């Protein structure tokens, strides 16, 4: 197993460390994920019955006779959304809830995502070997103390690395495991349950990828309740959100254009926003009042640009989204007669337009590397909506718990309250985190996406400005975590070690906590 191949290809040093050629990127992808209505084709739906409203987040299938259909995919690149539009023919109807690799789209455009953007970084596990992946059972047997023959010098160095001022040793947990042998090379308070800060995003990333799949795509749709007479739609247009955390103004503009393509020039009704896929709670449990908006925008199943409206974060993201759609419709030549509002669509409507997000793997990658709280919370609610029937944080963390338990993660002392780690109620142990990291390596279907969600020391994400001049640069990939009472760093050192450091205090010195973490990671990197 070459874990160095999981490092970033951004920067010369990282490319050398990872044994990757500079500028290498993903293979060209064809976009075949979305069928749009095209009024000019003057075709009919093939379905025998009227399209039904979705009972799950999978978009309704709109199979149209005729040739040119518009396909669209949004690409997240360091937080920037970009709309790619092309023309082509769908040879096989794609599964819009999963990666639509089955759908072949013949298009005059060849779209490559790679060297120009972080989201196109190629990072694959090469040469994975069985002994490299220690099982959770072995980890539990060994975690009580370092294995016989452990490098005493390394243990001493790791011990000294953690002993810094203003960080309580009694509230510091650390564990390092040799991936080649499965032996524990260092352990301190590994079973102690501590507040994990943003290390909470690790179980969320794993559960989302395991349950939804790396190719899963969110969708947002416009459904009409009414009839089209001439160029006038008599009725309302419903903007329905299904939890896409990356929905942006450009996507609404494209949706509005698709509505106009039906020949609609006036809506004799209103634009109504439906955010009922999630509950109405805007924050997570156990959050400090100051975290609202400052650390995460208000949570909603329907939010455009994270609820930004007229330069400010709206307390009602869905209503703001409806207003933005109305503006987009007017720009597309569609006038709307009534004022926007929110509501819940309970009747059968006609799907007029649909937007599909980039794959979940890209979204999780951004969430992990940039430690994005909003995305983490949206993923938790999505898990609850899809698998528990309730788009709530409580339902979502229950799904995460069940996923972890299902793969044998030791959950003694673990408590999951939210997705981001902002909650003071969250608890993880170093034992659980290292077991989760090893599970992420062992899962072939999600391994690449899980590993690529980690930041690279001295190269990108939340580790870009850390360990830049140490032996750990480009050798350590990890998830950071910082609040006023907690600090954490968990991840991998090349293909040799998996480690986790959790530190708590009231307050804790983030400065000294990070020094301890960096020394610990550097000692592991120097050990070879």
Task: Describe the residue ranges of each PLM region.
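Mid-domain, small-residue-enriched loop/turn segments at the edges of structured enzyme/sensor domains
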Residues: 171-173, 230-300, 307, 333-334, ...
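Beta-lactamase-like hydrolase cores
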Residues: 141-142, 146-193, 253-263
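Short, well-structured active-site flanking segments
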Residues: 210-225, 333-342, 447-451
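Active-site SXXK
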Residues: 182, 196-214, 271, 302, ...
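Bacterial N-terminal signal peptides
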Residues: 130-143
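Small-residue-rich helix-loop
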Residues: 185-187, 384-528
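N-terminal targeting segments
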Residues: 5, 9-12, 16-19, 23-34, ...
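A small/polar active-site loop signature that marks catalytic segments
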Residues: 308-444, 448-449
């Amino acid at each position: 197993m070459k874990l160095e191949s999981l490092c970033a290809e951004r920067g010369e040093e990282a490319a050398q460390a990872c044994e990757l050629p500079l500028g290498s990127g993903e293979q060209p992808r064809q976009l075949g994920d979305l069928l749009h209505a095209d009024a000019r084709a003057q075709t009919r739906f093939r379905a025998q019955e009227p399209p039904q409203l979705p009972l799950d987040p999978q978009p309704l299938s709109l199979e149209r006779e005729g040739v040119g259909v518009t396909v669209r995919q949004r690409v997240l690149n360091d937080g920037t959304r970009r709309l790619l539009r092309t023309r082509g023919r769908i040879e096989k109807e794609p599964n819009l809830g999963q990666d639509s690799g089955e759908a072949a789209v013949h298009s005059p455009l060849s779209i490559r995502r790679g060297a120009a953007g972080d989201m196109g970084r190629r990072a694959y596990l090469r040469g994975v070997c069985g002994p490299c992946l220690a099982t959770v059972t072995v980890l539990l047997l060994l975690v009580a103390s370092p294995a016989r023959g452990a490098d005493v010098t390394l243990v001493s160095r790791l011990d000294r690395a953690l002993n810094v001022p203003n960080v309580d040793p009694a509230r510091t947990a650390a564990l390092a495991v040799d991936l080649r042998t499965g032996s524990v090379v260092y352990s301190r308070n590994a079973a102690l349950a501590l507040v994990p800060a943003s290390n909470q995003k690790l179980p969320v990333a794993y559960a989302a990828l395991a349950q939804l799949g790396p190719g899963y795509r969110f969708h947002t749709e416009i459904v009409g309740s009414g009839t089209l007479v001439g160029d006038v739609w008599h009725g309302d247009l419903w903007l329905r959100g299904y939890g896409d955390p990356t929905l942006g103004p450009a996507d609404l503009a494209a949706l509005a254009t698709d509505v106009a393509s039906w020949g609609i020039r006036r809506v004799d009704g209103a634009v109504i926003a439906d955010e009922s896929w999630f509950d109405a709670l805007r924050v997570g449990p156990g959050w400090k009042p100051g975290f609202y908006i400052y650390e995460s925008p208000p949570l909603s199943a329907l939010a455009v640009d994270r609820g930004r409206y007229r330069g400010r974060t709206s307390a009602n993201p869905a209503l703001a989204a409806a207003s933005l759609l109305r503006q987009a419709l007017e720009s597309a030549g569609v006038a709307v007669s009534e004022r926007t509002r929110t509501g819940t669509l309970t009747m059968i409507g006609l799907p007029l337009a649909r937007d599909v997000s980039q794959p979940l793997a890209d979204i999780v990658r951004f969430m992990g590397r940039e430690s994005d709280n909003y995305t983490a919370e949206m993923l938790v609610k999505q898990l609850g909506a899809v698998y528990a029937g309730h788009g709530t944080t409580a339902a979502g963390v229950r799904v995460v718990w069940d996923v972890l338990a299902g793969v044998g993660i030791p959950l003694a002392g673990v408590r999951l309250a939210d997705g981001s780690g902002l909650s003071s109620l969250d608890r993880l142990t170093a034992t659980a985190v290292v077991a989760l990291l090893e599970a992420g390596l062992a899962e072939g279907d999600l391994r690449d996406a899980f590993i690529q969600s980690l930041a690279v020391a001295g190269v990108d994400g939340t580790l870009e400005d850390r360990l830049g001049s140490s032996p750990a640069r480009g050798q350590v990939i990890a998830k950071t975590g910082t609040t006023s009472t907690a600090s954490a760093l968990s991840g991998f050192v090349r293909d040799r070690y998996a480690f986790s450091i959790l530190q708590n205090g009231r307050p804790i010195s983030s400065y000294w906590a990070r020094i301890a973490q960096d020394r610990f990671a550097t000692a592991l990197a120097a050990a070879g």
